[in-house]
């Protein structure tokens, strides 16, 4: 089977885990006029990529995928607990939990998941997204590096979809923005892959504040 198909499957917006329901604070940034055009949108996404994802979320996800590939189940469980504890707001916690639960439901019904991974997943009451993503990558024969690339692409694609729904930003403008951001996506992946685990961490105060404010946003399209 063509290995690209598995990668496209993992990165697809049709993966039934509800990622389209969440904006990760971007909807509130638009509401507050911090993001109001293509330039400010590029700045917001760039900052999230290089100051948050590249320094913490991406290396943590990569570590999940590597532990799953190595069948280091104790390490994977430890990383999952760290991921769960690192969610800074209620909405970000609920987002990761809901998407992880949906991925668990999907994987449990598929034949590709091996018995050891299935047993680990079965005993997870609240599997978060990173754990499910790592097990999906293992089940579909996707390398940790490619699984991280798929996750970063899915994140970027979702952020652009949010912008097209909340700003006067059309599909062609979104594609131009994609061209501008792809080098940063590559930069984030490279940084995550080479970062010392002792230096994993970020201080994304703007994201946290936007996420907390979104809980009280009067009219909204997204759940985070």
Curated annotation (Swiss-Prot):
GO molecular function, one term: nickel cation binding
Superkingdom, taxonomy of origin: Bacteria
Main localization, broad class: cytoplasm
GO cellular component, one term: cytoplasm
Residue ranges that the Swiss-Prot or TrEMBL entry lists as coiled coil: none
Classification via InterPro entries: UreF (IPR002639), UreF_sf (IPR038277)
Pfam families in UniProt: UreF
Stated family: Belongs to the UreF family.
PANTHER family in the record: UREASE ACCESSORY PROTEIN F
Free-text function comment from the UniProt entry: Required for maturation of urease via the functional incorporation of the urease nickel metallocenter.
Protein name, UniProt field: Urease accessory protein UreF
Gene that encodes the chain: ureF
């Amino acid at each position: 089977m063509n290995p690209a198909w598995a990668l496209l499957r993992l990165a697809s917006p049709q993966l039934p885990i509800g990622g389209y329901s969440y904006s990760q604070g971007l909807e509130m940034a638009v509401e507050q006029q911090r993001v109001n055009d293509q330039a400010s949108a590029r700045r917001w996404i760039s900052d999230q990529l290089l100051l948050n994802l590249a320094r913490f979320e991406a290396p943590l996800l990569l570590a999940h995928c590597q532990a799953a590939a190595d069948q280091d189940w104790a390490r994977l469980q430890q990383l999952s607990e760290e991921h769960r504890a690192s969610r800074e707001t209620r909405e970000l916690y609920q987002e990761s939990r809901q998407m992880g639960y949906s991925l668990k439901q999907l994987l449990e019904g598929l034949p590709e998941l091996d018995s050891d991974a299935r047993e680990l997943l079965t005993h997870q009451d609240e599997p978060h997204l990173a754990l499910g993503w790592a097990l999906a990558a293992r089940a579909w024969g996707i390398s940790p590096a490619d699984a991280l690339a798929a996750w970063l692409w899915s994140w970027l694609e979702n952020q652009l979809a949010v912008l097209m729904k909340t700003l006067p930003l059309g599909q062609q403008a979104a594609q131009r923005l994609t061209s501008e951001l792809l080098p940063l996506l590559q930069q984030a992946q490279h940084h995550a892959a080479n970062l010392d685990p002792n230096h994993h961490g970020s201080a994304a105060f703007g994201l946290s504040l936007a996420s907390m404010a979104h809980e009280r946003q009067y009219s909204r399209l997204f759940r985070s």
